[in-house]
Amino acid sequence: MAEKIRITLIDNSEREVLQGTTTTQIAASISTSLAKKALAARFNGQMIDLSQPLLEDGRLEIITAENEAEALELVRHDYAHILAEAVQKLFPGTQITFGPVTDDGFYYDFAPKDRPFTEEDLPLIEAEMRKIIAQNNALVREVWERDKLISLWESQGEKFKAEWAKELPEGQELTIYRAGEWFDMCRGPHLPSTGKLDPKAFKLTRVSGAYWRGDQNNAMLSRIYGTGWLNAKQLKAHLERLEEAQKRDHRRLGQEMDLFHLQQEAQGSVFWHPNGYTIWLQLEAYLRRRMKNANYKEVKTPQLMDAALWEASGHWGKFRENMFVVPDEIPSTDPDKPVLSGKGNLMALKPMNCPAHIQIFKQGIRSYRELPLRMLEFGCCHRNEAHGALHGLMRVRQLTQDDAHIFCTAEQIVTETKDFVNLLDSIYRDLGFTSYAVKLSLRPELRAGDDELWDNAENGLRSALEQVGITDYEELPGEGAFYGPKLEFHLTDAIGRTWQCGTLQLDYVLPERLDASYVAEDGSRKRPVMLHRAIIGTFERFIGILIEHHAGRFPLWMAPVQAVVATIVSEADSFAESVVEKMKAAGLRVVSDIRNEKINYKIREHSLTKVPNILVVGKREAEEGKVAIRKLGSRDQIILSVDEAIALLLEEATPPDLK
């Protein structure tokens, strides 16, 4: 007879059940409605299927749609499997690879027999997926011996699945999930059946190419993306967000507003146009003022440095593949045969600024009286990102960071963290962001330092957060770097998307590797703690975020063109030009539009480029020395004298830190 086991439920109530009882049975014993709503379970911290037998004492949480994060993970996983099944039914001979869940959906990579998939195939595949959902096939977990599964894959011509399985240890048991006749290798868990999915809550969105295992030397596959939700209402809301995101796409607005461009000859590097660079300069000037007021010392360090420094810092071993490396060469008389200098040294463009900042710290003898030392650089770095990963301003190869490093003692960590978080919060609010989430990455399994060091570091960050009123942060066990815990700050933009921008990383290792020290109060030499910190991250990416957050409608202090003086008749041209000159002299960024075009055409054109203010002048305004101010997006206008208009615009155009 089966033994009894003790199951603790989420409300801490306990039940004794027979060993081998399933979550389905336990849910049914609680209530019929719970049994119907149940999707999966978490048992002793592990996600499991409802049908998986429980073999030991443990804590059980029954997952329903109310557990939205877990439920979405489950349904998207199932949609990916159903996508693969549908494709193989419609396109016989297609080989399957893998299909993970993404932030808002799923994708699956295929090796088609005849041709790559196109967007024209998607409606047909969607229809087949709905048929599979309607069949309500049970999703059954099976355990197979590795070698038998490999033989099966090979007999079916599934070379990619077979290749993957062959790399797993011999004798290892593998799990598959079967839905009717179709199955796929998968760890699970899955919903009880395909009928648990809402057939109106998913949509296939696009296709692309992808290399097998992400290696360009491997076969090119066809990737199909989809988005999946718990119900049709969620899908509709998501598609509306996507539509809004497309309207705000920084690449489209960047072109419409003449901010920047990218081109093939400089992949991953940005050509900033005058309008875009004006935004950059305003942002940089604002940050420079804020950092100066917070007692940061700005520095400038070389972009090209010897590989020996990167070896000493540890970046060479861990980051070399992402670095642009050049030999230290001396040109020869034969242009086809460059001659290496004596040692044939390798140089590398810096991917980050921290080793260079330590070199400045090491110049001369540092005293504890100088700490904390806050060192800032708007440092240009280069990272050799894969071509396929590049994306507008959001992922580039040449990037400029608002990078700073705080050298301090262990006792100063809490105070410095508090000051940093307060500064970050103030800057985000100035830039139009009122909401952000905080995550604390904790010690990984492999780490430098002992448990006491990590206890103090992690508790110090917790204490600092709580002292500034942040109590709902998320802890991420095992996600910290090997050299220290980290805080991450994730902004929420105007349409609800999150962007990880700010970081504060404790580092006990790099100062030791690069032999940084200071003279302590007792005369001994000690290592400083190094706090790597950023607020906006990189200028390129953050400006992309700003463009999309504001939909191109920048606050006046940051707008590249703050006003256009547009004429109705040619008799007002000279007056318009005099207004522009007077406003420029006052410090405003203003241009004139005296073209022989109708005023409505001019207004429409400048509205498309998101100019915040259009100052309309006709014959009457010119005679009276006035302008009619029309705000972007408004049909109303106010009539002011030129001096009144200048005063109004100057007040609105004052950066938030100078008000």
Swiss-Prot record:
Determine if Metal-binding is one of this entry's keywords: yes
Q: What is its EC number?
A: 6.1.1.3
Can you say where in the cell this protein is located? Cytoplasm
Q: Name its co-factor(s).
A: Zn(2+)
- What does the function comment of this entry state? Catalyzes the attachment of threonine to tRNA(Thr) in a two-step reaction: L-threonine is first activated by ATP to form Thr-AMP and then transferred to the acceptor end of tRNA(Thr). Also edits incorrectly charged L-seryl-tRNA(Thr).
Query: Family assignment?
Result: Belongs to the class-II aminoacyl-tRNA synthetase family.
Record-given protein name: Threonine--tRNA ligase
